[in-house]
Amino acid sequence: MTVAPRRLAWTNARQSYPVRVAHVLSVNLARVRANPDPRAQSKLTGIDKVAASEAVMVRAPGSMHAGVGSGLVGDTVGNPKLHGGDDQAVYAYAREDLDAWETQLHRTLHNGMFGENLTTSGVDVTYARIGERWRIGSDGLVLEVSAPRIPCRTFAAFLDLRYWIKTFTRAAKPGAYLRVIAPGTVRAGDTITVDYRPEHNVTVGLVFRA
């Protein structure tokens, strides 16, 4: 059954996250399935993510059209014309924002439910600056914040929520795409350290709302 969520009470004000060590809560890989959007060009989708039990290799996937799609080995991009590639190699979403959506939607949202590769904790992803670099774990992995996620029909169909694209857009909590600066492995529990933060104030949320 398709459910229309209530109007969000969120504002665009910065959210106060509990003080904790920023870390990767879950690393999620695609469980390939039929695309739930009957109008989609691609008949398969990788939006359905499940937690990986071991470390996952992350490397630059190459161009969107000619590369391997996702930056995570073992992950799958269903429509390489719109997703994946070097500038969308990894998608991160904050567990804190998923928790807020659970309250809003009155349903459980497991890690990876929004199609994110990395479910983070202690990171305000919306206020990450474009060009900001994250060092993750101890294996040399460095990622750079590149862009916000733009919701698509497959996302809405996967969650089976009417008006989801408008609802998600209005909330302005899009999560962030990241490019791979230095390859390495990532696993649940790895710390996230901001290695570099640009002096500008262009954040993921600002670009999303532009």
Per-region residue spans from a language model:
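Short alpha-helix capping/helix-loop boundary micro-motifs
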Residues: 120-122, 175-182
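Short, basic/aromatic beta-hairpin or loop at an interaction surface
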Residues: 107-115, 160-173
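Loop/turn positions that initiate beta-strands
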Residues: 131, 183, 187-189
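Short hydrophobic beta/alpha edge segments that flank linear recognition/processing sites
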Residues: 191-196
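Electropositive, beta-rich accessory/interaction domains or terminal extensions
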Residues: 2-137, 141-154, 200-210
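A structural signal for small-residue-enriched, beta-sheet-centric alpha/beta enzyme cores
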Residues: 173-177, 188-190
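Histidine/lysine/aspartate-rich catalytic loop segments that bind and position anionic ligands
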Residues: 146-168
